[in-house]
């Protein structure tokens, strides 16, 4: 099997250590400062069990999210969208957003951040922490009332 020429990477989800966000939400980190020098994007996948989500939050960088599998509800600012596999969002830095699994099976998203140093700010509390740090484990049951204006 051919290996990529460094500093290139080939990432296989089945061998990547998962980041358990709690309550049935698991992240598989792909490209980031943990494995790539000089990267300008941070990428990965997050798998949501039925009825779960991540609280309304914002980032210090832009983010694009592709629904890879399942059915999602995305809240972006004051707008709410139902999405299915193959549909995507783009969220500018600083805009509150969240994703919930609205389906009966697993929902998987593929995310891309436009930066190397990514933070998450929880809208309800104003708490900011580094993406995928120990503080970044606040997943839980999907909250239908998540809206940016309810911060």
Where are these regions (language model features)?
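Short beta-strand His + acidic residue motifs that chelate non-heme Fe in jelly-roll/DSBH
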Residues: 54-56, 74-75, 91, 97-103
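Glycine- and acidic-residue-biased ligand/ion/polar-headgroup-sensing regions
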Residues: 62-63, 67-72
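A generic "binding-loop/recognition-motif" signal
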Residues: 50-52, 60-61, 79, 95-96, ...
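Short, charged/polar surface micro-motifs in flexible loops or helix N-caps
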Residues: 35-39, 48-52, 71-73, 115-118
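Short acidic-glycine-tyrosine-enriched beta hairpin
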Residues: 78-93
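A short hydrophobic beta-strand segment most commonly corresponding to one strand
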Residues: 46, 90, 105-121
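A short, N-terminal "cap"/entry segment at the start of jelly-roll beta-barrel domains
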Residues: 1-40, 124-151
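Conserved short histidine dyad/triad with adjacent acidic residue
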Residues: 27-31, 44-59
